[in-house]
Structures are given as C-alpha cells and as structure tokens.
C-alpha cells in the first residue's frame, strides 16, 4: 500500500521564506520544561523588581484598578486580583481538563497504576499540613496549613527533563499522576476551607450554569463556543457567590466532554473530504473541517488552545505578580525566626519527602499498586523530595490564607526557601541514589516468557 506523506503545513507556501525555529527549540517549548523556565524567569524578575530602587512601582502597578463593565453590571478589581481570580481560572481549567482526560482515556483508569501515586499524593497532602499545624497551632498563623500541600508540576517535570534518558519514563508518569491527585486535593481545600461570605443568588446562577453544561454534554454538543460562553457565565456567577472564582475553571475542565468519538463519526470524514475534492467551495470546506473536528473530543481541542496560554502566559504572569517578596535585612531576620516561614519550609521539604515516599512504599509492599519499569526506590525518594517544590498553588493559597501582608511575606519566603532546598535535595538524591537502590516493582514491566511445550529435547547438533 502506498503511503501518503502530508506536507508540513496545509495551504500554499509563502512567497518569502521566513526563518524557521530550530526543532530543538520547538521541542523545548512544547514540554513542561519550557513553561518552568519562563515561570522561573518571571519569579526572578519579580524578586529583582521588588528589591530594586524602583520597588514602589511594583506594588503600585499590581494595585492598579481595572474595570470590566457591561451596563450596570461589571467587575472592578486590581491587576493583582485579575491575575489571581481571572487569569488563574485558565490554569485551573487546564488542570481540570487533564484530570478529566486521564480518568476517561488515560492512566487513571487502571487501579494498580494510580494506587502508588494516589496514596503518595494523599501522604503528601496530610503530612505537610500536619507539620505546619504542629508549628502553628493557634492564631491567624494557623490558617496557612493549606500552603505546603501542593506540588508545582511545571518545575518538577522541568527538573526531570534535565536528566534526559537517565530518568525512567514511568517516574514521569508517577509524578504526573501524583500531581493530578495532588491538584484535586488542593482544589478541594481551596473550595471548602478558604471560602466565606456566600451569596445565594450567585450560587444559584452557578448551579444553573453547571446544569446547562451538563445539558450540552447530554445533547452531545461538540462545538467549543457554547462551552466557552457557559464558562464565562460560570466564572462571573462563582465570583459573585463568594467562592473563589478559579473553581469555575476546574468545573469547566471536568465537565467538558473527553469521551472518544464513535466509529460512525470517524467514518463520516472521508465522505465530506470526497465531496470537497469533487467541488471545492466554502460550504464543503466548512463541512469537511467540522467533520474532522467532531472526531476529536472537546476536551482535547480546548486543552490544545488553553495549555500554551496557561503555561507561557498565565503562570509566568502569576509568578511576576506574586513572587515579589521584599528580601531586605529586616524581612530576612524576621523570617528566620517566623513560625510561618519555618513551618512552610519544613512542611514542603520534610512533609512531601516523607509523606509521599512512605505512602508510596506502603502501597508497593502491600500489593495495592506497583511502579513498573526501571523505577527504583532511589527514584521514588528523589521524586518525593522534588514534590516539595510548591510554588504556583502555594503562592495562590497564601493570598487566600492571610490578610496580613507581613504574614504573606513570611509565607512567601518560606515557599521560596523550601522549594529551593527541595529542588536541590531532590536533584542530588536522583543523581546519587537513583540507580543504586532496588527496583520498586521488579518483573512487572514485561511478562515472564513461557516455557516451550513438552517434551523438551536438546537441539540436534549440526553435522
């Protein structure tokens, strides 16, 4: 059968050849490592800006008010709140889309595959919160127990990318699955424990919008515009309700259909393509494009649109808006003895390393799950330590947990210090112990070869 090679891009070529991006650069930008580098650069820029002679402009800029109004209704927030309440809804929508896809068609369908990272994530949620609460048992400081409960997936996967082939693929899968379960826990904490002053009207409108999205699913609506319009209404309703508006992104991500297309939908595409080949006109082009799009779940198409925006725009801007901690001598001396700073740092480093590794080993030893492939206990410990890099969601919860700016500054210093130590310690553990400890689940990656049927005879020697 003759294979047809598709052109690199559809449509006629340009008359003027534009410079092409190197394949290595394209591959880098397509990975989590690219987003992690941008986030790191944004955080460094925020720190330099906040500690420069122009530090006052940092606070003034993010305190600038921006208004979005339609008639008598509208939203009036500072740029800082637009980033945290508005733009971050896109980030959480991507998280919800990934969770929904993994549960529908991905790795989260297999109980034994998800058991180890799921139990590890639970350990990584409970122990850090417990360590922080032991250090801060009372007063407004105790509200920060949710800060060290999250893992920054972009940073962790970015660090693993530096190891290249030496890092088992199954370890990346373990961390991605752990991050998904971890995000579910962090989102639940935000929705339940960091919400107050509920508005019944806003909740009612939000509930009706969720029902409308479910109705779109039931009707098998595959086009994206109805879901996007409902998402905007849901965001506004949840923002008015008093629940943190980013929950709208999570709900939309979970509700957008991720079910693979039916066989008859795929079989329809060649029909429209043949009709287009017979007579190329705008109507038939539209039908062929629509038929092709209908074969891709709405979840995948929306994620393809939102993921680059989230990784390369939203998250770096969030880092720029929230990582600007004042690191003068007075602030560092206060942080060195602050129970908030010490509690956050200790919980991120020790809580995640111990909680995830102990729970993961327990799941393996009890037979609840397995870590197949070349994953060793040294890899598990190193990955658990890297999971202590809690940047994006930790900074996000800090803004919700504390109203006192001094406590926010102390928590952010703890996040920066704890994440830095966790990154260095995890990298060292992976390099030193990664290949020197036993396999977590030996003989589970490949089936054991069967013996040939009896009678067994020695091969006849050649004459």
Curated annotation (Swiss-Prot):
Lineage top rank: taxon: Bacteria
Residue numbers spanned by region Disordered: 444-463
GO biological process, one term: regulation of pH
InterPro entries, per the entry: Na/H_antiporter_dom_sf, NhaA
GO cellular component annotations of the record: plasma membrane
An annotated Gene Ontology molecular function: sodium:proton antiporter activity
Protein's membrane topology: Multi-pass membrane protein
Transmembrane segments: 28-48, 79-99, 114-134, 144-164, 173-193, 196-216, 232-252, 305-325, 344-364, 377-397, 413-433
Catalytic activity, as annotated: Na(+)(in) + 2 H(+)(out) = Na(+)(out) + 2 H(+)(in)
UniProt subcellular location: Cell membrane
Signal sequence residues: none
Pfam families: Na_H_antiport_1 (PF06965)
UniProt keyword list: Antiport, Cell membrane, Ion transport, Membrane, Sodium, Sodium transport, Transmembrane, Transmembrane helix, Transport
Gene3D superfamilies recorded: Na+/H+ antiporter like domain
Family: Belongs to the NhaA Na(+)/H(+) (TC 2.A.33) antiporter family.
UniProt name for this protein: Na(+)/H(+) antiporter NhaA 3
Organism whose genome encodes this protein: Frankia alni (strain DSM 45986 / CECT 9034 / ACN14a)
